[in-house]
Amino acid sequence: MNVRDNTLIVGSEIIETPPAIRSRYLETRLLAPVFMSYFQEGADWTTMPRPVLSDASFDLSYARDTESTLGGPTEPIEDPQASPFDVGLEMILDGAQCLRLGRDIVINVANQNHALAVEWLKRHLEPAYRIHVVHRMSDNHIDSMILALKPGVFLARHAGIQEMMPEPFNMWKFIVPPEPEPTSFPQYEDDDLVLTSPYIDLNVLSVSPERVLVNEACGGLIRELERNGFETVPVRHRHRRLFGGGFHCFTLDTVRAGDIEDYR
């Protein structure tokens, strides 16, 4: 359902990223007919090296640091098992770890798997695009940590995000909404699989420089966006913590209006 997670659209190129979650390994195959149609129209279609995803593939240091799992639940591999297919640490990265800002791409790196994947992307995309690394802004995805609402304006989880951003983007305006209200979420049992943090509603979708799709249950977020001059479109999505994503996650921007910008 969260089609943005394992795909990165850069210019006219579709890049399938190497997933970290074994159960999502073949997820982009469901999008193959869509990608094929764009390929036949002239788009480039690239797949990053696919990881084996044995226990030895993972850098476990971040998952073992339970105090730093900022993006949501992270499950450590408690007892790694050897496999005849082990190849050592592999490149692993989700498209949702990347924030595209014209010719600049900001990528969250929380472990060595991410760093290897970023090195591949640098060799593949530079110098046409500039790759910037932010360290451990989250465990992986950053689209409930920071989103670009329009050129010059970010929506951020907390004020400290600004210090993590590279120049010149740390000089943009950062809108920090109120903390999420516990009453805006359905109540779940202890054994329910809750996939996201309560900050998932920052995962809004900008459909124009002035208009933002936002969860109707988030009155504080809606008021803060409107106070900053945005038109909000409230949309109902009650069980976003179970579905593991918001409106930004649900969409993949294969078509955009306008030309690529350079904010340098």
Specify the residue positions occupied by each region the protein language model found.
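The feature marks the mature, well-folded catalytic cores of soluble enzymes
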Residues: 1-264
